[in-house]
Amino acid sequence: MEPSPTTGGSETTRLVGPRDRGGAGGGLRLKSLFTEAPEPLPEEPKPVEMSFHHCHRDPLPQPGLTPERMQAQRQLCTACAVCCVFMAGEVVGGYLAHSLAIMTDAAHLLADVGSMMGSLFSLWLSTRPATRTMTFGWHRSETLGALASVVSLWMVTGILLYLAFIRLLHSDYHIEGGAMLLTASIAVCANLLMAFVLHQAGPPHSHGSRGAEYAPLEEGSGEPLPLGNTSVRAAFVHVLGDLLQSLGVLIASILIYFKPQYKAADPISTFLFSICALGSTAPTLRDVLRVLMEGTPRSVSFEPVRDTLLSVPGVRAIHELHLWSLTFTHYVASAHLAIDSTADPEAVLAEATSRLHSRFGFSSCTLQVEQYQPEMAQCLRCQEPPQA
């Protein structure tokens, strides 16, 4: 058979007779594959661009030694080494000077060493990946380490306050003013060095995403979030409290060196500056408890988030709105959005997620879209929580 043209421009086939055979062999005359241009291949379909949204603006803290964690480890290791050296010196100096204030400062340095070692352990533990049991990973171990640091300082300070009170009641003690002055001067230098090591500058400049160790501002709030690694921040505040106490001990040692009869300055300085150390750790303790109690992040208010979700086109009501922190710098939100029957659920979900990410910096958002029902207005579980 061979194709034959028709008037319609299509091809038909007919039987090939003997007279159409060419050559001695009488084979079939086939249409050559090379006499006509090959038909063009069909074009591959172009990918269709679709609007895409996801529930994560930035990933939650990833397991492994990130640059921020490596920097925190270096800072804590260096400060811990400095602290150990000068703590040993203060123990010797305090013993030789018979100074309770110097021993108090040494005890605070001991608490610093313990808290820094605990922070290093919790920092290492936080690098472990999430599991089916620990679905958020071990990131909160860092917060627990900060809590242990504050609690240890408060316990040691309470003991030293008691000893200072006993010395104020009984004056049967002697203090070597020269040894106390020398040791106090070294202690001030040691605390200044540790504060310099642990000091954290502002967040590095970054394009496109927010760093792992800081969070953006809430739109219109003007209040920045806590900066820096949690463990380093707690250790830095801890050292600042010790620095204040060391300065007080230095002033007391100068007074005792020139006026030995004023030896009561030793327990008095211990009493006053221990209270300052307690007060300096109160903000850290407050922030830690807020995270552990699943409280609303300090830089995010409930009302602006609620109003932002209600302003999304198609949203009639919201309920089950929960805002909490996984760490000091990673916020999580969840809510139920009740929408009109004519609203597009996917469009509402995409717009609401985008607004939460861009305006408040939530790391993860879980939103459930459902049809609005009139009985929601009377449901107790659909009402807003009262003011604290």
Curated annotation (Swiss-Prot):
Membrane topology of the entry: Multi-pass membrane protein
InterPro entries: Cation_efflux, Cation_efflux_CTD_sf, Cation_efflux_TMD_sf, CDF/SLC30A
GO biological process per UniProt: response to zinc ion; zinc ion transmembrane transport
Localisation: Cytoplasmic vesicle, Secretory vesicle, Synaptic vesicle membrane; Synapse, Synaptosome; Late endosome membrane; Lysosome membrane
Lumenal compartment segments: 97-105, 167-177, 257-264
Binding site for Zn(2+): H108, D112, H238, D242
Protein name, entry field: Probable proton-coupled zinc antiporter SLC30A3
Organism taxonomic ancestry: Eukaryota, Metazoa, Chordata, Craniata, Vertebrata
